[in-house]
């Protein structure tokens, strides 16, 4: 009887707490203004001036997924938030993922095999956040089937039970129930699968996203709700007065000017560089980041099953690799190699050859995949977290880590893309407590859609096609990229009459101008790699687009020849991070690799690849 009363009391208490929170959140949401359809951010110059002259509740350093999430969470709680990033928003690890929104089947396998409750909690939490991301980023996420090949009948029960457990943990958040297909069905779905000893396959459901654009749109949504943000602004030192952090000294990487940004609290969301900023707070701080590089290659769509992904359950280095359809291509990755601190790493020959070998091992295409078919290769660094108070590395997991450092720096790191919103919520909760901030309400980011998400449906492309007068395939891509905000392209198209940026991928010149005005793109590489994604898909095509993108910037901002030359050089250096250096020459005659003067290449309307470095 006593136990029953205790259970009843706890149930009523939890129900009342839940109801109170929902009512509180609902009242706060009513206070938050819906963004107007014609909203666009202030100019970069205006943002920089505000960073110089105002005092903020929070200064967030690092504009990847977690930092962007912190800016949005803080702004929607009524806090005054500043956000800076040394490069472009999300241009580091956050744009170089496998594009999955997932619980993590490998973490579930570890949870079962090692009886590890922390891994189980990680999966359960991530599956909940997957559902939330589908709600708040509707046009940048989608569900996808993933095939897991089985080459031994003994393993069929293992994969069947494991993926059914994944379904069960998903519960009402499930995107679909996993199922078994026999050998014939597996071959029908993926004609080029390695058929030797193939017994069949399991198919399960998970999520996929456009990570780079999602990151950018989270930042834009934060700015729309009052945050002040600037990309290409690097943190150089912390401002410490009386043993307390009062701001960040930064450098504007565009103009070279110094900026002091003052704030009650500073959040370190710099990912794999978190230890660098922690040592600015405390020179003796023990490292918490173990860096692991992950490389992906982009190859033709034929190397993945029809309308589904493919999971290589055991690579030659005892990991798993995904073959995921994405924007008419296939992404394959990733590697897992311990690495050093680096803001934007370049892919290596070893990574490229390893991934080509993995594709060759799991496909039966003849001839086998060659370097000529690789259109891009890029590397990101996972910020794996270890406990600074534990000397061994056994504590390294994918959970996130939030703590206050010696002089008050708040560090949030670890985790993964799928749980960025929860990481940000935990960081802002701690910031409010640690810095005695006064928010106007609780966290509401579970219910705040990114710009372009309100009113979006699967048929939004039809409205875009009607309004812009573009072919169906272009309208569908615009809907998937911009959501309902694609309709804002109308005024740009009327002005420019639908000029083509890339015939190969149906990108429009108008999109470049739109991204400059509406998405804070300030450099050529911002457009090519983090807004239009051409660099991520096809690095040589991105190289060919440099002049056209440069032309739009020159016309809008009046760039002189010196600035244009610097931007061109910066863009080429950035494209090297997407494989331009190690892929150049593939499938081309060596004579075509000679440099041309700008006048000659513009006269020809085509750029020749620069010579390969020795």
Curated annotation (Swiss-Prot):
Organism whose genome encodes this protein: Encephalitozoon cuniculi (strain GB-M1) (Microsporidian parasite)
Binding locations of FAD: 57-85
Keywords: Cytoplasm, FAD, Flavoprotein, Oxidoreductase
Protein name: Probable glycerol-3-phosphate dehydrogenase
Domain of life: Eukaryota
GO MF entries: glycerol-3-phosphate dehydrogenase (quinone) activity
Enzyme class of the recorded protein, top EC level: oxidoreductase
Segments of skewed composition (Basic and acidic residues): 598-614
One Pfam family of this chain: DAO
Co-factor requirement: FAD
Location of the region described as Disordered in the Swiss-Prot/TrEMBL record: 595-614
Record pathway: Polyol metabolism; glycerol degradation via glycerol kinase pathway; glycerone phosphate from sn-glycerol 3-phosphate (anaerobic route): step 1/1
Family: Belongs to the FAD-dependent glycerol-3-phosphate dehydrogenase family.
Biological processes annotated in GO: glycerol catabolic process; glycerol-3-phosphate metabolic process; NADH metabolic process
Disulphide linkage map: none
Annotated catalysed reactions: a quinone + sn-glycerol 3-phosphate = dihydroxyacetone phosphate + a quinol
Compartments where located: Cytoplasm
EC number: 1.1.5.3
